[in-house]
Amino acid sequence: MILSTFENNNKSANVCKIAGEYEVMFYKDNSYLNSQVALTEQQAENIAEDWVLNANII
């Protein structure tokens, strides 16, 4: 289930809750790149926001 989406230019990240775990799914140019598990929803949102705002993450 997608909880939130972060977008900036050609990058986006979805914060999801899958099987009780929070996961951030990273996209660039609408193509899936990678994902990362987080301990809390807030941590997942912070990771997602960092990804879309900073070019050097991942």
Question: Which ranges hold each PLM region?
Answer:
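Short N-terminal "domain-start" leader segments
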Residues: M1-M25
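Short beta-strand segments
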Residues: S4, L33-N34
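Short, mixed charged/polar active-site loops
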Residues: S12, Y32-L33
